[in-house]
């Protein structure tokens, strides 16, 4: 978004962040990162920004097919993702900002079951468990979602058999020199290539590499000034250059 604002727009009006995982890990149900965080994130209410206010939606209420490069159309669901909250502050011409993520029908079916049987609960429940010394039972307290995390596949172990790719980008509409323009910047990341390089799947790769680059920008003094800042408040050019060099090459469509 910052790169687009610097190079291609006088005003950004509409921003859609689009996140597609078109991979297959060959598991009946698994999350690509911490199950506790992932399930809580997608079962909470959706949120987007429009005309100066935030609009809340029911979980997964708003969805539409979006077409992703080299992947094709995938059903995409509006979620609450916190980066929108800073972007609309730092780019105040934005009229609407939304975040979209893809999910397959099998994943959503399992998610419905998890919710319906109470396994997505984050409050404590009492459970009778055998005592460690084998002398009987005792009442212990467990959080259902934390227990579910313990029995689901470990996201770190998914990479070996993961096939396909991710596609993450920003679709932007705004004004440059008095005329309306559209711009799409995105990266596609192969799960197989990510595993060959790091032993991890593509979702972990696309999460970790940008964070590493941000830390490098700070440590080298490229991104450093007094106070607390979000990444979009710094010069985007060196960051985008490093994405190309560190395994996440990006592409543009106008």
Can you describe what each PLM-predicted range is?
Residues 4-254:
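C-terminal catalytic/substrate-binding lobe primarily of soluble NAD(P)-dependent oxidoreductases
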């Amino acid at each position: 978004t910052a790169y687009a604002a610097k190079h291609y727009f006088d005003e950004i009006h509409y921003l859609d962040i689009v996140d597609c995982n078109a991979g297959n890990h060959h598991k009946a149900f698994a999350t690509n990162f911490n199950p506790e965080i992932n399930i809580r994130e997608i079962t909470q209410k959706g949120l987007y920004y429009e005309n100066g206010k935030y609009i809340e939606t029911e979980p997964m209420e708003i969805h539409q097919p979006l077409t992703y490069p080299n992947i094709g159309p995938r059903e995409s669901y509006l979620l609450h993702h916190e980066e929108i909250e800073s972007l609309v502050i730092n780019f105040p011409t934005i009229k609407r900002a939304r975040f979209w993520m893809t999910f397959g029908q099998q994943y959503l079916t399992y998610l419905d079951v998890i919710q319906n049987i109470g396994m997505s609960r984050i409050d404590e429940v009492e459970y009778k468990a055998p005592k460690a010394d084998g002398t009987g039972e005792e009442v212990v307290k467990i959080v259902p979602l934390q227990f579910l995390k313990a029995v689901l596949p470990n996201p770190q172990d998914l990479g070996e058999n993961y096939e396909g790719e991710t596609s993450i980008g920003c679709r932007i509409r705004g004004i440059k020199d008095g005329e309306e323009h559209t711009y799409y910047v995105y990266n596609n990341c192969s799960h197989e290539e990510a595993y060959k390089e790091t032993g991890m799947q593509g979702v972990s790769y696309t999460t970790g590499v940008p964070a590493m680059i941000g830390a490098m920008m700070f440590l080298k003094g490229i991104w450093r000034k007094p106070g607390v800042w979000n990444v979009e408040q710094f010069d985007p050019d060196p960051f985008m250059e490093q994405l190309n060099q560190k395994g996440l090459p990006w592409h543009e469509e106008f």
